[in-house]
Curated annotation (Swiss-Prot):
The chain crosses the membrane at residues 8-28, 57-77, 84-104, 118-138, 143-163, 164-184. It catalyses: an acyl phosphate + sn-glycerol 3-phosphate = a 1-acyl-sn-glycero-3-phosphate + phosphate. This is Glycerol-3-phosphate acyltransferase. Pathway: Lipid metabolism; phospholipid metabolism. Its main location: membrane. It comes from Prochlorococcus marinus (strain SARG / CCMP1375 / SS120). GO terms for cellular component: plasma membrane.
């Protein structure tokens, strides 16, 4: 049976969204402590809220799963030999699923770990570069949101540097969109950072 490129593209976008929607953090909270992370702390189902309210080991598993969701979306698109525009569409579908999961009535995470996965899938150099910036900022200030915001802001710069020889407009575009999404999801954190009220690792929200 032959499938048109549009059918394959729609299938890829749907699978990428559903993959991104996998509520790993929510499930960790429910299965381990019987809590709903959407009602605790930052209200996010991401790894940071899991770390603060469930524990280090569950947070590491959630982080790994969320990164894998982003990588998976890009690899699925690449496996179908879809072009760069459709690859970034798959990445954005995965990010959208993570932020607005259908299973949790649209209340999910902040797109940091899944975003890392997307960029590791697109360009491992950019993905590792942003991860390095995240870890550097985190080691100095011990504030996860500041590290996440810094890593997000670095994405367009890293992508531009990495694209000197093979410039890709779609990849540049997704780096800006991902940055905006992460900043928007961290808008309350930004306010607390400005006020000097953002908690460091080891303290609750």
């Amino acid at each position: 049976m032959d499938f048109s490129i549009s059918t394959i593209a729609l299938f890829t976008l749907l699978v990428s969204y559903l993959l991104g929607s996998l509520p790993s953090g929510y499930l960790a909270g429910k299965w381990i402590l019987g809590i709903d992370l959407r009602e605790i702390g930052s209200g996010s189902t991401g790894a940071t809220n899991v770390l603060r309210h469930v524990g280090k080991t569950p947070a590491l598993f959630v982080f790994f799963i969320d990164v894998t969701k982003g990588i998976g979306a890009i690899l699925i698109a690449k496996s179908f030999l879809l072009d760069e525009s459709l690859q970034i569409a798959a990445g954005l579908a995965s990010l959208s699923g993570h932020i607005w999961p259908v299973w949790l009535k649209g209340k999910g995470g902040k797109a940091v770990a899944t975003g890392l996965g997307v960029f590791l899938g697109i360009s491992w150099q950019v993905g590792l570069g942003s991860l390095g910036i995240f870890l550097l900022i985190l080691s100095i200030w011990r504030i996860v949101s500041l590290a996440s915001i810094s890593a997000a802001i670095s994405l367009p710069v890293l992508m531009l540097i990495n694209s000197k020889e093979t410039f890709s407009i779609p990849y540049i575009v997704i780096s800006f969109i991902a940055m905006i999404l992460v900043l928007w999801r961290h808008r309350s954190n930004l306010i607390r950072l400005i006020k000097g009220q953002e908690p460091r690792i080891g303290k609750s929200n």
